[in-house]
């Protein structure tokens, strides 16, 4: 087996994501015929500091969401440079694309074009070496199965209802294995569905497979989840915890937080009080994007108030970007980063962000996007880096379930070497 294996072809095509929007899929072929394929996800509530997702803008085709320009960039500019390169040198591949793009936000080539190529190269390399993707990326120490952060009630941008906060999730941190954690979540999901039906609520699902009932308040969403956990036979706050993603940047207007569904307009301090009240009443272990991406003072307030009690995840705040994360670490805000590959655009930069977070004592939560495909890269990534937490939707809709099923396969492959850390995955909580 050679330590230099040439890339002989890089090509992209337009495929559909789970919201019926076009996205980029890339094939990378090696000199021995080995192929790697990756499809790129897309977000609905996107941070303003994210790398650029290149869309065509022609309203007559796919409502302007076509990605033919990104595909052309893969098939010409990127392919011309990468053909002949060593697929086993991921850093050189990603560095070459970053230099080809030449912008600070992937605005020329598009993060969707670059990420598709980056991941397809990694998959081709793993296939050539006869390794699982998590083994190739993480090496012999890749062994930690993640605690799922499972979205079971959708609101905000992910659903057409009057619930302001975007995601209400469950985390089975009290499970003893990943497969048990998944079973617990599935049982709570079914329990929740029957409860919602009994209460006369709609059980249609949102983009990520969670239910999207027209509840009266955000607190009612938490209450019905607690009820569903108990109905399924589990103890809230012992076996299963609650996580929230308010996606606060979406409700931040003129320096205040507008909870339209509840008829409230709150200052940053009042918003922190709102969360603190919920944390005191319910078994909440994690809040993501509790404050808006540009509300640094709000982030300081929430970190002072809750930063030793619960996990505070920065998504729009950090956008998987080491420059943004450095600012957060220096200012002492948040204690966790959400990792979304397409926010930054290459595997190398993603790994750098995870490493920086962990060195600073921040956890890293590997995440899907609301527009997903059958691609399961993030399941391998979360094990590769021993992150210990994954956010990839409800146990419904096959683009979500694909990731969970891949994790079951990895758990099976690791056998006794595999480790499910449960509450130990929250090393950022000091209480």
Swiss-Prot record:
Which Enzyme Commission number(s) are on file for it? 4.2.1.11
Q: Which organism is it from?
A: Clostridium tetani (strain Massachusetts / E88)
The pathway where this protein functions is: Carbohydrate degradation; glycolysis; pyruvate from D-glyceraldehyde 3-phosphate: step 4/5
Superkingdom to which the source organism belongs: Bacteria
This protein's record includes keyword Metal-binding:
yes
Report residues binding (2R)-2-phosphoglycerate: 166, 340, 369-370, 391
Q: Which reaction does it catalyse?
A: (2R)-2-phosphoglycerate = phosphoenolpyruvate + H2O
CDD domains in alphabetical order: enolase (cd03313)
Know the name of this protein?
A: Enolase
Which keywords accompany this UniProt record? Answer: Cytoplasm, Glycolysis, Lyase, Magnesium, Metal-binding, Secreted
- Cofactor, how bound (note): Binds a second Mg(2+) ion via substrate during catalysis.
**SUPFAM superfamilies associated with the record:** Enolase C-terminal domain-like, Enolase N-terminal domain-like
Task: Fetch the InterPro entries from UniProt.
Answer: Enolase, Enolase-like_C_sf, Enolase-like_N, Enolase_C, Enolase_CS, Enolase_N
Entry-linked Gene3D superfamilies: Enolase-like C-terminal domain, Enolase-like, N-terminal domain
């Amino acid at each position: 087996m050679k330590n230099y294996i040439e890339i002989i072809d890089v090509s992209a095509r337009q495929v559909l994501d789970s919201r019926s929007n076009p996205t980029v899929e890339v094939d990378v072929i090696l000199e021995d015929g080995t192929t790697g394929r990756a499809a790129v996800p897309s977000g609905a509530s996107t941070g303003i500091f994210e790398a650029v997702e290149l869309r065509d803008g022609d309203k007559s085709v796919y409502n302007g969401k076509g990605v033919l320009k990104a595909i052309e960039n893969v098939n010409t500019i990127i392919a011309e440079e990468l053909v002949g390169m060593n697929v086993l040198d991921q850093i050189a591949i990603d560095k070459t694309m970053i230099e080809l793009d030449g912008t600070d936000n992937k605005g020329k080539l598009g993060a969707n074009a670059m990420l598709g190529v980056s991941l397809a190269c990694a998959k081709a390399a793993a296939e050539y070496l006869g390794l699982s993707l998590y083994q190739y990326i993480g090496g012999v120490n890749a062994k930690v199965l993640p605690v799922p952060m499972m979205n079971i009630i959708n609101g905000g941008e992910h659903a057409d209802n009057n619930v302001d906060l975007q995601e209400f999730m469950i985390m089975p941190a009290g499970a003893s294995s990943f497969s048990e954690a998944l079973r617990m979540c599935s049982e709570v999901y079914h329990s929740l569905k029957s409860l919602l039906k009994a209460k006369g609520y709609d059980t249609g699902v949102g983009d990520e497979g969670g239910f999207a009932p027209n509840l009266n308040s955000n607190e009612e969403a938490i209450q019905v989840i607690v009820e569903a956990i108990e109905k399924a036979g589990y103890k809230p706050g012992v076996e299963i915890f609650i996580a929230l993603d308010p996606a606060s940047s979406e409700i931040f207007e003129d320096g205040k937080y507008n909870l339209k569904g509840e008829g409230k307009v709150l200052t940053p301090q009042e918003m922190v009080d709102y969360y603190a009240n919920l944390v005191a009443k319910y078994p909440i272990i994690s809040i993501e994007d509790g404050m808006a991406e540009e509300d640094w003072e709000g982030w300081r307030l929430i970190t002072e108030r809750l930063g030793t009690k619960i996990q505070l995840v920065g998504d729009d705040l950090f956008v998987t970007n080491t420059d943004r994360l450095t600012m957060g670490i220096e200012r002492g805000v948040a204690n966790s980063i959400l990792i979304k590959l397409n926010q930054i655009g290459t595997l190398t930069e993603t790994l750098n962000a995870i490493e920086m977070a962990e060195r600073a004592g921040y956890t890293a939560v590997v995440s899907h996007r609301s527009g997903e495909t059958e691609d399961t890269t993030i399941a391998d990534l979360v094990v590769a880096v021993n992150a210990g937490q994954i956010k990839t939707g409800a146990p419904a809709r096959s683009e979500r379930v694909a990731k969970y099923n891949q994790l079951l396969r990895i758990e099976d492959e690791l056998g006794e070497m595999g480790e499910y850390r449960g509450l130990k995955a929250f090393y950022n909580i000091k209480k």
